[in-house]
């Protein structure tokens, strides 16, 4: 074997070794676990943690610590979800100069056992894990092989970038530049979060009213078996452009506990009035209140459905909610609405199909005819039209509790409650909606109010049996604005007419008292 051949063979071996180490870093299966607040969080204080995650997501280890006058205090160590800032980092290194709380992440089993601060490159770790001194031979080999390894790493990194693009990893979510809380991170666990009372229970868990420092927040707690719903909701909230006044305000996400005792938390803004369902059960609404709720609800759904390129924080894809109902619309103190609960939501990105997404999801009562039939066209517009059918039913719920018309206001009922009761089966809904093509009743007295008559027409165009004939959320928003303007004009004209009639009356002259 010639000298050139030997050299090529050596470079090949080094390249393979480098490739193995680089590709191996993404195979993080276990991390060192530590929680300084273990007593309060009711978890283990230290040990190891198995990292769970989807096959197409990368897993990392992380560490957070404080440096108080040269004394290192570890706050948390454990597993960390897919984050581009952690890719291909075998060492857990903080690069900021002097943060209040140091944070680093890395790839590789137990890579967070030791952690570093890059300006000084000092190893900061528990006293039980002393730094091991590298032998001189190791340093000699390292410095001599650096040039060759750099070339090998560049080649392999280029190949990895090509594969990364080809396999179409989900886009990494960067923090939005809109004002508001930072994206979810383990540092949220440093703030005292106290659960106060259960406010609601649903398919994927329960919602608590909680106290975060001086702020009242909502905490949605998922059991570990509903991790996919928690992860999907977290990813939807973290998309660029999702900070909107009519979409529930997202604060952060956390994993509490270990192994089978793990709970998954989503922390959002808290709204005391609760859901639209709860509000309509206890209250009637005026015409102006109906318009305010309906307009802001439509505005939130329109923003969710919209594909918006060129935002400062990236491209916002169109998102279908897939579980629109009055229970998932929350009311703020001023009665403006915000859309909540994205556990079933689906995002649509250019060049990607909906794939194997199961179409028959959501709440049966609000399922569109095509969903009940299982005849869904798995394209973006089809899913958005399914949302609009359910939106029409929510508008009907609002109309049923409005005092604008002269007729009586009925007790609150869910859509189709008269026909199928409170717990319909899939077959019940198929019979009523698909075969009989029934819809909730639009009262005759509603037609006598100009605004309510236009609202009834809008509702019918939202729940049309032909999906392609349904209105968009943006169109509904514009219609509601026009409805309110029209009724204001009519009211003003009526007042002018009455005043004119009164001023044109010939009153008899007053008799003199003299």
Swiss-Prot record:
| Domain Protein kinase span(s) in chain numbering | 193-486
Q: What is its EC number?
A: 2.7.11.30
> PROSITE patterns under this entry?
PROTEIN_KINASE_DOM (PS50011), PROTEIN_KINASE_ST (PS00108)
**Membrane-topology annotation of the record:** Single-pass type I membrane protein
Molecular function as annotated in GO: activin binding; activin receptor activity; ATP binding
Q: What class of enzyme is it?
A: transferase
Side Cytoplasmic, residues: 163-514
Keywords (alphabetical) are: ATP-binding, Cell membrane, Disulfide bond, Glycoprotein, Kinase, Membrane, Nucleotide-binding, Receptor, Serine/threonine-protein kinase, Signal, Transferase, Transmembrane, Transmembrane helix
Q: Which GO terms describe its biological process?
A: activin receptor signaling pathway; cellular response to growth factor stimulus; pattern specification process
| Annotated binding of ATP, by residue | 199-207, 220
Q: Where are the transmembrane segments?
A: 137-162
Q: Disulfide bond among the record's keywords?
A: yes
- Residue intervals on the Extracellular side: 21-136
Query: Which Cys pairs are S-S linked?
Result: 31-61, 51-79, 86-105, 92-104, 106-111
Which Gene Ontology cellular-component terms appear in the entry?
Answer: activin receptor complex; plasma membrane
The UniProt record lists the keyword Membrane: yes
Active site per the UniProt annotation: 323
Q: Where is the signal peptide?
A: 1-20
What's this protein's family per the entry?
Belongs to the protein kinase superfamily. TKL Ser/Thr protein kinase family. TGFB receptor subfamily.
Biological role: Receptor for activin A, activin B and inhibin A. Involved in transmembrane signaling.
This protein is called what?
Activin receptor type-2A
Q: Which organism is it from?
A: Xenopus laevis (African clawed frog)
């Amino acid at each position: 074997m010639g000298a050139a051949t030997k050299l090529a063979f050596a470079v090949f071996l080094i390249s393979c070794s480098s490739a193995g180490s680089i590709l191996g870093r993404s195979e993080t299966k276990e991390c060192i676990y530590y929680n300084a607040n273990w007593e309060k969080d009711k978890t283990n204080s230290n040990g190891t943690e198995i990292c769970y995650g989807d096959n197409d997501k990368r897993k990392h280890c992380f560490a957070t610590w404080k440096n108080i006058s040269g004394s290192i205090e570890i706050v948390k160590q454990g597993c960390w979800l897919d984050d581009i800032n952690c890719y291909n980092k075998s060492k857990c290194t903080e690069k900021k100069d002097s943060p209040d709380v140091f944070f680093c992440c890395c790839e590789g089993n137990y890579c967070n056992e030791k952690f570093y601060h890059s300006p000084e490159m000092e190893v900061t770790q528990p006293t039980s894990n002393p730094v091991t001194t590298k032998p001189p031979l190791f340093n000699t080999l390292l410095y001599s092989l650096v040039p060759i390894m750099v070339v090998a790493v560049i080649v392999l990194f280029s190949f990895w970038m090509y594969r990364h693009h080809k396999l179409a990893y989900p886009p990494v979510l960067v923090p939005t530049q809109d004002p508001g809380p930072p994206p979810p991170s383990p540092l949220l666990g440093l703030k005292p979060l106290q659960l106060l009372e259960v406010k609601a229970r649903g398919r994927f868990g329960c919602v608590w009213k909680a106290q975060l420092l001086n702020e009242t927040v909502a905490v949605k707690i998922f059991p570990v078996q509903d991790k996919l719903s928690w992860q999907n909701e977290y990813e939807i909230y973290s998309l660029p452009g999702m900070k909107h006044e009519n979409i529930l305000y997202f604060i952060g996400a956390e994993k509490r506990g270990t192994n089978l005792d793990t709970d998954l938390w989503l922390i959002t803004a808290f709204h005391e009035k609760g859901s639209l369902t709860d509000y309509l059960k206890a209250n009637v609404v005026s015409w102006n209140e109906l318009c305010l709720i309906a307009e802001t609800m439509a505005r939130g759904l329109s923003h969710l459905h919209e594909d918006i390129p060129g935002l400062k924080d990236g491209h916002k894809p169109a998102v279908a909610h897939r579980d629109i109902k009055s229970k998932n619309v929350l009311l703020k103190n001023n009665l403006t609405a915000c859309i909540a609960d994205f556990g079933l939501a689906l995002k649509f990105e250019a060049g990607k199909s909906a794939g194997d997404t199961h179409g028959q999801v959501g709440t049966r009562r609000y399922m569109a005819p095509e969903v009940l039939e299982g005849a869904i066209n798995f394209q973006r517009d089809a899913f958005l039209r399914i949302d609009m059918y359910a939106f029409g039913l929510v508008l009907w719920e609002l109309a049923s509790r409005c005092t604008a018309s002269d007729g009586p206001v009925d007790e609150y009922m869910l859509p189709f409650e008269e026909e199928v009761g409170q717990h319909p089966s899939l077959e019940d809904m198929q019979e009523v909606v698909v075969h009989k093509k029934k819809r909730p009743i639009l009262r005759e007295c509603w037609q006598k109010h100009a605004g309510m008559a236009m609202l009834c027409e809008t509702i019918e165009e939202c729940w049309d049996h032909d999906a392609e004939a349904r209105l968009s959320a943006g169109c509904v928003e514009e219609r509601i604005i026009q409805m309110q303007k029209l009724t204001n004009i009519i009211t003003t004209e009526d007042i002018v007419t009455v005043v004119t009639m009164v001023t044109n009356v010939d009153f008899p002259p007053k008799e003199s008292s003299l």
